[in-house]
Amino acid sequence: MEMERKFVHTITFGCQMNEFDSELMTGLLEGMGYEPAKSLREADLVLINTCCVRESAENRVWGLLGSLKRYKRDKPELIVAVSGCLPQQEGTAEEIIRRFPVVDLVLGTHNRHELPGLIEEVRAGRRPVLGVRQPDSAVPEGLPVRRKSGLRAWVPVIHGCNNFCTYCVVPYVRGRECSRRPDAVVDEVCGLAAAGYREVTLLGQNVNSYGRDLGEGIDFAALLARLDGVEGLWRIRFTTSHPRDFTDRLIEVVARAAKVCEHIHLPAQAGSNRVLQRMNRGYTREDYLDLVARIRAAVPDVSLTTDLMVGFPGETEEDFADTLDLVRRVGYDQAFTFVYNPRRGTPAAGWPDQVPEDVKSRRIQELIQVQKEIGLARNRAEEGKVLEVLVEGPSATRPDLLSGRSRTNKTVVFPGEPGLAGQLVRVRVEVGHLTYLAGRVED
């Protein structure tokens, strides 16, 4: 007798670590017989993997949960599961259950591996199921992962964060830093390369802290050096790096390791020493600029991207001018810019000197405009150069063109045959646009 097919629709908010968590949970569900749904309406299970780092992501989750009421009305047996960082906040899991009766299951960031058992509880009629756990030191290994790409893979190397920036909820919802064993990371990457994956991105809230908790004398630079020797692997990327912990040894490995790409995401957050100190970032603007100079001296073609925040409590016009000055001095290839939002449970949320919303709005628009000009100039400087591009497939916006990534993590589009997907090609850049490069394959 043929088993009834079951479908899951997964919706992910937030960072790359959340993307990986969704791939992992989807892999676990696949082991239960669930297949990816083509649409939300086809789903027997809706899995919403949430983020609470920024207010906008949290608000989108609330809106989505409200919209599911009609789907549950049409399909009462539909299971709605909410996971991720949002339920991990104190009291929020209970709030989700109270505000949204459509939700059958809530779990957090530390017990994703328990998802199949929790789903079975729901199917047995015990709903709602509240499955949020507090963090412990264990990092489960060997769990199935259903990756979106067969070419590039996320590989977490460290979970959690010990930094406690005054605006950030991550240490509270992800827990303290917990590194994976180096052999486990190397074995996973070797397995991916053997399966045909050509690029891995090593993930962590702060990859530069890797190994400190292991007591094995290994750090992130040493891990990178080991992974550079994996046969069949073409490229290694990593994110995110805390500027305070970016060592000269790591710079040396990035410069010398053939497979480590020349792209570094280096969140500055602000350019004012006063603001950086209040943020508890652990470095000054002078420290940051010195680090950038050392990176560029060792890796001349490096592309640098960053995160920047405006409107942090107490930020003055002079502080904001310092941030604009930092952006101009560094010359980022790209910047992810954000308006400060108070996050529940963080020190900065309770400070009295909150910046008015209209001031935040003006500053973010000015920052975006400055970075647009710099980013466009950086991309136009690529015109005439020949770049190595890993072809991903048809462009999402121009299906008649192929799209891929350079080693410096720039999107490159060009004419070509679909059969080039998964290959490395040399592309001469003809035009540098704001968000991508356009060119032609060199014969």
Curated annotation (Swiss-Prot):
Its EC number is 2.8.4.3. Residues 380-443 form the TRAM domain. GO terms for molecular function: 4 iron, 4 sulfur cluster binding; metal ion binding; N6-isopentenyladenosine methylthiotransferase activity. Signal peptide: none annotated. Residues 147-377 form the Radical SAM core domain. Its cofactor is [4Fe-4S] cluster. [4Fe-4S] cluster 1 binds at C15, C51, C85. Keywords: 4Fe-4S, Cytoplasm, Iron, Iron-sulfur, Metal-binding, S-adenosyl-L-methionine, Transferase, tRNA processing. It is found in: Cytoplasm. Residues 6-124 form the MTTase N-terminal domain. It is an enzyme of class 2 (transferase). Its main location: cytoplasm. [4Fe-4S] cluster 2 binds at C161, C165, C168. PROSITE patterns: MTTASE_N, MTTASE_RADICAL, RADICAL_SAM, TRAM. The keyword S-adenosyl-L-methionine applies. Belongs to the methylthiotransferase family. MiaB subfamily. Monomer. Catalyzes the methylthiolation of N6-(dimethylallyl)adenosine (i(6)A), leading to the formation of 2-methylthio-N6-(dimethylallyl)adenosine (ms(2)i(6)A) at position 37 in tRNAs that read codons beginning with uridine. This is tRNA-2-methylthio-N(6)-dimethylallyladenosine synthase. It comes from Desulforudis audaxviator (strain MP104C). The gene is miaB.
